């Protein structure tokens, strides 16, 4: 199939299944993973390679991502270029379709021939559905299969609507043998695809479900090129290759170079070329920027040399002043040291006395400590007793609870047993009733049947009696009916007269009323007008008064509305601000209350201990451990679940306070607590550091706790070095790591892995034992906090009152505003109505007055005669009187008629209706009895089933009762042993006695500790007195030492400046002043080089020399940096400390020397102060920084140059590799293209050539074609048939380069003439034995050469097919005719021979019968003329070609490309020459016409056999007319000659 011009649409109307996507490459996301070669043993190396390239590159020109491009490995060449040729090949055996498109049910298309199979059939029969079936299996979208969605592929016809369709392709590998083939063992496989009505589809390989990717991989492994689809050429697509541009102009289309690159496989290198090209472009830009940065750094460095010289001079003078100052301070320090020695002796004596007191105090403390240890043992013993006591108490409580539950369960089961037995009794009674039901039902049925028979008899008798009395009714009703008939006639006559008189009376009444109205019209109208005038005047007066009142009232309300509209927003803003203040104050108060509330611990123990701390009795009490630290809520479960008990410990600073806490708790009978003193916790400070020296793979719990540093040891003693992981799996993984050896690992949900490997966890996660919000940490509520809370509460109350008052004012004003708006709207509306009414009322009153005056005049004119009116009234009264009389007569007749009808109804009811009512009543009773019979019959039939159901229910109840009885027995067995309960109670009482005994012993110990504590207090007083004496001496000595230290600090602060030595600046030895030496290895410019090469080498030499110069300068500048530490900081922050003098030299300085040094110091300081404003000390450091920056830029430039060179070198290597691979394949394809096209066109020529040989991938490839006996043309300028031939030639040439196992083509011969179709058919049959061709064709000279024909036809709207081998049919026909003894031609060679003989004989007969005309040539003359034309045409062509070859050499009509191939001259250059040659060598047509004006041209002669698709019999009949020239036998040579004549005619035109 030709290349696709655009990618498939992302979505279609079909299913969203991935299997319906067209097999086109989709751009993948860009990634930086290296592209490695495919793994060994991969199922499809080419697929793995393409996937790897797609993961790395998406084909876009995006930005460079700075990844290491040299780590990428280039993909290897495609497998088809390297793997050896196989002896076997793939072929399609047949295609099975099931309800696919026009195929209903299962059908097998084929089997196909190994070489050439032709699909034939009439239009619309379903030939192209074969290609659609292949496309369907190969994974194309529905839109590519001439369908909107997948479900449309399912067969649909009259009465047939299957729910799915399936296509299965049978493949096999074969080895060709003469005339047949052998199937390779175990090479057969099938691929199928099924589509469903819901637009989904599925794949299968050998019947096994598979994915679309697996199908594509399997097809690639058998060399089916599903990427380019060259094996598939659809109808009308063969010419698309001709329409391809040399190179694509947009991303969606494909050019000739891309088309060939895809097939050759060099496109695998294109992403690498683009990637390296982007990197080289960026590196080139970076290189230019780096050179600019280097030059800028050098200029900045040179500009700072003069300020550096001045700064060095200043530093030297400053060092001189510092040295003098140092000598004076050293002399003063020595005087203070001489005072300290006597005081030190007295201090040593007092320390000895204090040591004796301290030893006595330690003895006392040891006794106290022993007492505490004994107390601690006692406390632990009591703790164990308390624990056992609580445990036994809980067991006793649990036993009681369990016994109560057992008794309740026993009671519940016994109740259920009673209930189940009652239900069972009900079912037993129901069963006995059901057993007796059939007998009762039978008796009732028999009784009902008897009643039914009686009712049937009554019904029958009543109906017979009714039918019998009908005749009697007819006899008795004859007289009344006659009378009724006469009365009806009378009534009709009276009714007509009444209607006639009524109409006359109505008309007369209307005339009278009209005349009466006319007489009164003038007077009535005048009265009405006067009333209206009076009413209008009265209304006008009222409305005018109302208008005068409304105007001032409206103005008043309007002013009020404006005032309220202005005041209300202001009031609302004030109220809003007040509410905001109220909300802020409320929030502050709530926050303060929460803080104060959280500070007051809810625990009574903590509260009581805090009071003791405030009283000063337990000074170092801190609180509960969990309240003293904060942790992230994420880790709350980890610490609370695993260390929950430790978080409840009470923390004190000293051990003695821990004892005081315990005594306090015991004395006040408070719950027992565990107290931990901080001074007894031993831990390494390094363990408390947030970042341990050996980092662990997860955070430590101790590092996650935020607390006071003083309390950190308490938390560390609890969690140690425990770390926390996210999950149990992660914890197990970390536990196995060497770094976590000996470390406890916790999880977020509360599990723990101990260092020994034991695992605990699985229970409920505990939370709430430690704070998760730092703001909630406990602190003491001070009086100031309480006062602040009261103040805020008072302020909140005031603000609330003010806000309520403002809110009330706002509501009141809002109501006033609404009322004002309503009033203004009402008054405005009323004012406009009244104003309009007043304005319109005055003109209306004037109009009414004028109308009244006119009406008075009109009334005087209208007068009616009173006599006429009286006569009319008499006529109306007479007619109405007559109407009433006739109406009374008609009513009497109608009443008589009703009497007669009533009499008739009575007779009918007496004789007939009574019997019918009786029959109807019997029928209703009978129907009711029949329903009862049916009901009882159903009860009889259902009785067995109901009894079985009752039996089942009884059995179920029995099982339930038995089950519940067993449970009751089990519960009875579980009764608690009273002896065991009694024993446990005795143990509890014993524990209580032991606890009381320990409590008494504890009180005694507490008393002894109080006595020891008093003695300790006395000794501490004496020790304190000695300590104060020592303190006074120390303070005196400290004052002297402080002065010495102060002097020493000043001496230590005295520093001299480092004086840098910039020797090369003083000598002015610059690199730019040195002479540059040119290296002998530099390339020399050759005079034979092109100007571009010379210019390129000049630029290269300039860059090399510039880099060498700066490298030399870099070496010189580096000397400045050799001593960087000696002058790196010369601004006073980190200068060199001054060298101090020895004590001997200090003692040698006399007072006179000191005074002289003071004077000299002042002079130096004045000089330094004078120079300080003129110099910039920071210029020295800045200069050093500039030198460093310059050297860094030089190093960066060197590195950038080397990186650019390496990337550019790799880019050129990949480009060259791509070009060489492409060029070798390109030459192979081009050579075979020329050979194939020359064979197809009988002498034509075609070639693929580079538009730009240096870079064919940029400009592309042009496809040049020279049809036989014509000039060179671009393929897009050819005719349709020539385009088809050119495209097919390229397809066949590509087949030789990259063979495809099979080809499926749809009417590729549609645009070809008879001769070219035959050539294509012969080529397919003879020249391509290594492939299978399946061609759909309607041309007989194509399908007649096929090895096998598959006929497609339709029956009842469904497609069917049949396959035959033409040669086999002919052989069978030959055998049949031979067996019958008939000489009939059946084989193709025999038929051709017989046809040629028949043609020769008919031509001879035509010549013999031909009449001779003096003015017309004979047949022999015409034949001679044709031969002459043929010979002269060939001679003329050869002469023209020779002339072109001679003239093209000096005039350079053809150019030679870089690869040695000759390019044809342009059409404009060759056109004049061809015209000249036509003049030199006249056309053969002129010679032919000169012999006779009436002889047909060769073109017309060819029309004799123009339609060569006509059967031989018809062609022989058409040639039998005497006026046509004799026909020659059909041989290949004669056909070629005729075609040559036609081509000559085309050239002459």
From Swiss-Prot:
A GO cellular component entry from the record: condensin complex
Compositionally biased tracts (Polar residues): 1440-1459, 1510-1523
Bias kind Basic residues: ranges: 26-36
Compartments, record wording: Nucleus; Chromosome
Signal peptide start-end: none
Domain named SMC hinge: residues: 619-734
A biological process from GO: mitotic chromosome condensation
Basic and acidic residues biased stretches: 37-59, 396-407, 420-444, 1460-1474
Recorded coiled-coil stretches: 326-604, 786-1058, 1144-1182
Residues holding ATP: 121-128
Region: Disordered, residue numbers: 1-78, 396-444, 460-485, 1440-1549
Gene3D superfamilies from the UniProt entry: 1.20.1060.20, 3.30.70.1620, P-loop containing nucleotide triphosphate hydrolases
Record keywords: ATP-binding, Cell cycle, Cell division, Chromosome, Coiled coil, DNA condensation, Meiosis, Mitosis, Nucleotide-binding, Nucleus
Listed GO MF terms: ATP binding; ATP hydrolysis activity
Main subcellular localisation: nucleus
InterPro entries registered for this protein in UniProt: P-loop_NTPase, RecF/RecN/SMC_N, SMC, SMC_hinge, SMC_hinge_sf
Effect of loss of the gene: RNAi-mediated knockdown disrupts prometaphase chromosome organization and chromosome segregation in mitosis and meiosis II and leads to aneuploidy throughout development. Disrupts mix-1 localization to mitotic chromosomes. Increased levels of phosphorylated air-2 at the spindle midzone, indicating activation of the abscission checkpoint. Results in cleavage furrow regression and failed cytokinesis during the first and second embryonic divisions.
Domain remark in the UniProt entry: The flexible SMC hinge domain, which separates the large intramolecular coiled coil regions, allows the heterodimerization with mix-1, forming a V-shaped heterodimer.
Physiological role: Central component of the condensin I complex, a complex required for conversion of interphase chromatin into mitotic-like condense chromosomes. The condensin I complex introduces positive supercoils into relaxed DNA in the presence of type I topoisomerases. Converts nicked DNA into positive knotted forms in the presence of type II topoisomerases. Also a central component of the condensin II complex, a complex that seems to play a role in prophase chromosome condensation. Both the condensin complex I and II play a role in meiotic and mitotic chromosome segregation.
Family: Belongs to the SMC family. SMC4 subfamily.
UniProt cross-references to PANTHER family, sorted A to Z: STRUCTURAL MAINTENANCE OF CHROMOSOMES PROTEIN 4, STRUCTURAL MAINTENANCE OF CHROMOSOMES SMC FAMILY MEMBER
Subunit structure, interactors included: Component of the condensin I complex, which contains the mix-1/SMC2 and smc-4/SMC4 heterodimer, and three non SMC subunits that probably regulate the complex: dpy-26, capg-1 and dpy-28. Within the complex, interacts with mix-1, dpy-26, capg-1 and dpy-28. Component of the condensin II complex, which contains the mix-1/SMC2 and smc-4/SMC4 heterodimer, and three non SMC subunits, kle-2, capg-2 and hcp-6 that probably regulate the complex. Within the complex, interacts with mix-1, kle-2, capg-2 and hcp-6. Interacts with smcl-1.
Protein name, as recorded: Structural maintenance of chromosomes protein 4
Species: Caenorhabditis elegans
Gene: smc-4
């Amino acid at each position: 199939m030709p290349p696709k011009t655009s990618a498939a649409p992302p979505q279609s109307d079909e299913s969203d299944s991935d299997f319906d996507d067209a097999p086109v490459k989709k751009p993948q996301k860009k990634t930086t993973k290296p592209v490695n070669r495919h793994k060994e043993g991969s199922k499809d190396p080419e697929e793995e390679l393409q996937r790897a390239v797609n993961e790395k590159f998406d084909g876009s020109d995006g930005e460079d991502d700075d990844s290491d491009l040299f780590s990428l490995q280039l993909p290897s060449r495609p497998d088809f270029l390297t793997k050896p040729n196989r002896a076997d090949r793939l072929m399609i055996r047949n295609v099975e379709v099931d309800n696919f498109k026009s195929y209903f049910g299962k059908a097998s298309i084929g089997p196909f021939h190994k070489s050439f199979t032709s699909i034939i059939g009439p239009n619309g029969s379903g030939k192209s559905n074969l290609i659609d079936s292949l496309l369907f299996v190969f994974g194309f979208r529905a839109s590519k299969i001439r369908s909107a969605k997948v479900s449309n592929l399912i067969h649909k016809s009259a009465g047939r609507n299957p729910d799915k369709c399936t296509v299965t392709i049978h493949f096999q590998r074969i080895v060709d043998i003469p005339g047949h083939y052998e199937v390779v063992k175990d090479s057969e496989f099938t691929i199928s695809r099924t589509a469903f009505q819901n637009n989904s589809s599925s794949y299968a390989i050998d019947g096994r479900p598979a994915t679309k990717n697996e199908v594509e991989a399997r097809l690639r492994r058998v060399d089916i090129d599903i990427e380019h689809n060259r094996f598939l050429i659809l109808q009308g697509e063969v010419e698309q290759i001709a329409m391809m541009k040399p190179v694509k102009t947009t991303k969606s289309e494909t050019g000739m170079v891309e088309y060939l690159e895809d097939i050759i496989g060099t496109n695998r290198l294109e992403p690498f070329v683009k990637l390296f090209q982007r990197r080289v472009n960026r590196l080139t830009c970076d290189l230019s920027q780096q050179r600019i940065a280097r030059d800028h750094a050098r200029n900045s460095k040179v500009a700072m040399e003069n300020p550096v010289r001045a700064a060095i001079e200043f530093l030297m003078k400053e060092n001189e002043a510092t040295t003098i100052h140092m000598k004076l301070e050293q002399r003063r320090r020595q005087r203070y040291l001489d005072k300290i020695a006597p005081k030190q002796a007295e201090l040593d004596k007092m320390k000895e006395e204090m040591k004796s007191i301290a030893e006595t105090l330690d003895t006392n403390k040891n006794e106290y400590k022993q007492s505490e240890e004994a107390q601690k043992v006692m406390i632990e013993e009591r703790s164990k007793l308390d624990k056992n006591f609580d445990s036994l108490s809980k067991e006793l409580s649990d036993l009681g609870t369990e016994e109560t539950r057992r008794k309740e369960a026993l009671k519940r089961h016994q109740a259920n047993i009673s209930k189940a037995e009652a239900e069972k009794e009900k079912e037993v009674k129901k069963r006995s009733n059901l057993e007796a039901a059939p007998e009762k039902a039978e008796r009732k049925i028999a009784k009902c049947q008897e009643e039914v028979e009686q009712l049937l008899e009554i019904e029958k008798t009543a109906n017979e009696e009714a039918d019998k009395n009908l005749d009697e009714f007819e006899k008795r009703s004859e007289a009344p009916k006659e009378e009724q008939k006469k009365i009806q006639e009378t009534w009709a006559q009276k009714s007509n007269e009444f209607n006639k008189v009524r109409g006359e009376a109505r008309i007369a009444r209307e005339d009278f009323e009209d005349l009466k109205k006319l007489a009164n019209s003038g007077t009535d109208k005048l009265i009405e007008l006067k009333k209206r005038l009076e009413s209008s005047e009265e209304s006008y007066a009222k409305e005018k008064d109302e208008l005068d009142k409304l105007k001032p009232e409206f103005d008043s309300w309007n002013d009020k509305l404006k005032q309220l509209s202005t005041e209300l927003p202001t009031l609302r803003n004030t109220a809003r601000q007040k509410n905001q203040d109220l909300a802020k104050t409320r929030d502050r108060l709530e926050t303060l209350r929460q803080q104060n509330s959280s500070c007051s611990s809810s625990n009574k123990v903590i509260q009581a201990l805090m009071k003791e701390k405030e009283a000063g009795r337990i000074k170092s009490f801190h609180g509960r451990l969990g309240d003293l630290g904060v942790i992230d809520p994420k880790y709350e479960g980890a610490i609370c679940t695993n260390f929950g008990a430790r978080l409840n410990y009470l923390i004190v600073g000293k051990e003695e306070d821990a004892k005081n806490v315990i005594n306090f708790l015991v004395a006040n009978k408070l719950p027992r607590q565990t107290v931990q003193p901080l001074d007894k916790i031993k831990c390494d400070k390094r363990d408390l550091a947030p970042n341990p020296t050996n980092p662990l793979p997860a955070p430590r719990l101790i590092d996650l706790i935020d607390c006071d540093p003083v309390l950190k040891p308490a938390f560390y003693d609890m969690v140690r070095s425990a770390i926390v992981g996210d999950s149990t799996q992660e914890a197990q993984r970390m536990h196995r790591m060497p770094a976590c050896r000996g470390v406890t690992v916790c999880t977020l949900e509360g599990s723990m892995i101990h260092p020994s490997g034991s695992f605990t966890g699985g229970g409920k996660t505990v939370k709430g034992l430690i704070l998760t919000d730092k703001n909630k940490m406990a602190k003491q509520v001070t009086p100031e906090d309480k006062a602040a809370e009261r103040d805020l509460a008072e302020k909140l109350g005031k603000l609330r009152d003010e806000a309520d008052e403002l809110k009330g004012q706002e509501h009141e004003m809002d109501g006033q505003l609404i009322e004002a708006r309503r009033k203004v709207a009402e008054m405005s509306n009323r004012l406009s109505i009244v104003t309009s009414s007043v304005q319109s009322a005055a003109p209306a009153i004037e109009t009414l007055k004028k109308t009244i005056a006119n009406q008075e005049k009109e009334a005087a004119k209208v007068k009616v005669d009173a006599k006429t009116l009286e006569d009319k009234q008499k006529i109306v009264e007479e007619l109405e009187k007559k109407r009433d009389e006739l109406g009374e007569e008609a009513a009497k007749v109608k009443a008589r008629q009703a009497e007669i009808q009533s009499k008739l109804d009575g007779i009918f009811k007496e004789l007939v209706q009574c019997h019918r009512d009786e029959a109807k009543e019997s029928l209703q009773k009978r129907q009711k009895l029949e329903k009862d019979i049916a009901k009882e019959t159903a009860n009889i039939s259902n009785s067995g089933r109901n009894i079985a159901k009752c039996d089942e229910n009884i059995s179920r109840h029995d099982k339930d009762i038995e089950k519940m009885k067993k449970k009751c027995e089990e519960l009875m067995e579980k009764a608690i042993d009273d002896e065991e309960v009694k024993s446990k109670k005795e143990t509890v009482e014993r524990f209580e006695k032991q606890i009381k005994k320990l409590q008494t012993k504890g009180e005694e110990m507490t008393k002894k500790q109080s006595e020891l504590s008093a003695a300790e207090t006395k000794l501490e007083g004496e020790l304190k007195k000695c300590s104060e004496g020592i303190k006074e001496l120390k303070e005196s000595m400290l004052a002297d030492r402080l002065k010495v230290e102060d002097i020493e600090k000043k001496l230590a602060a005295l520093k001299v400046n480092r004086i840098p030595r910039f020797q090369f600046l003083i000598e002015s030895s610059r690199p730019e002043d040195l002479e540059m030496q040119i290296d002998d290895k530099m390339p020399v410019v050759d005079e034979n080089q092109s100007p571009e090469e010379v210019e390129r080498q000049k630029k290269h030499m300039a860059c090399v020399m510039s880099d060498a110069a700066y490298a030399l300068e870099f070496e010189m500048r580096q000397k400045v940096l050799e001593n960087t530490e000696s002058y790196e900081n010369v601004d006073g922050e980190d200068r060199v400390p001054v060298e101090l003098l020895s004590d001997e030299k200090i003692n040698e300085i006399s007072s006179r020397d000191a005074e002289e040094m003071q004077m000299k110091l002042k002079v130096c300081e004045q000089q330094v102060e004078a120079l300080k404003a003129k110099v910039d000390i920071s210029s020295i450091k800045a200069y050093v920084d500039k030198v460093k920056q310059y050297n860094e830029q030089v190093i960066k430039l060197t590195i950038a140059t080397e990186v650019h060179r390496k990337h550019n070198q790799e880019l050129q290597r990949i480009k060259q590799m791509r070009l060489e691979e492409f060029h070798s394949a390109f030459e192979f394809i081009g050579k075979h293209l020329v050979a194939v096209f020359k064979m197809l066109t009988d002498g034509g020529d075609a070639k693929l050539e580079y538009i730009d040989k240096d870079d064919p991938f940029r400009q592309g490839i042009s496809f040049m074609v020279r049809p036989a006996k014509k000039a060179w043309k671009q393929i897009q300028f050819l005719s349709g048939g020539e385009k088809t031939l050119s495209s097919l030639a390229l397809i066949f040439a590509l087949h030789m380069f990259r063979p495809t196992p099979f080809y499926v083509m749809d009417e590729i011969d549609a645009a070809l003439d008879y001769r070219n179709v035959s050539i294509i058919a012969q080529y397919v049959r003879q020249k391509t034995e290594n492939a299978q061709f399946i061609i759909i064709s309607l041309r007989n000279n194509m399908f007649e050469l096929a090895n096998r024909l598959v006929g497609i036809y339709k029956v009842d709207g469904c497609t069917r097919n049949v396959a035959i081998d033409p040669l086999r049919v002919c052989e069978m026909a030959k055998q049949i005719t031979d067996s019958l003894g008939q000489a009939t031609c059946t084989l193709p060679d025999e038929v051709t021979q017989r046809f040629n003989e028949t043609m020769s004989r008919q031509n001879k007969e035509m010549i013999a019968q031909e009449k001779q005309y003096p003015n017309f040539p004979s047949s022999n003359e015409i034949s001679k003329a044709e031969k002459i034309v043929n010979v002269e045409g060939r001679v003329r062509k050869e002469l023209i070609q020779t002339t072109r070859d001679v003239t093209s050499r000096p005039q350079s009509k053809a150019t030679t490309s870089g690869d040695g191939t000759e390019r044809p001259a342009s059409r404009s250059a060759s056109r004049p020459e061809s015209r000249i040659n036509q003049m030199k060598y006249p056309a053969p047509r002129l010679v032919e016409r000169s012999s006779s004006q009436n002889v047909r041209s060769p073109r017309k002669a060819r029309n004799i056999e123009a339609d060569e698709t006509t059967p031989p019999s018809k062609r022989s009949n058409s040639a039998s007319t005497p006026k046509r020239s004799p026909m020659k036998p059909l041989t290949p040579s004669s056909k070629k000659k005729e075609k040559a004549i036609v081509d000559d005619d085309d050239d002459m035109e």
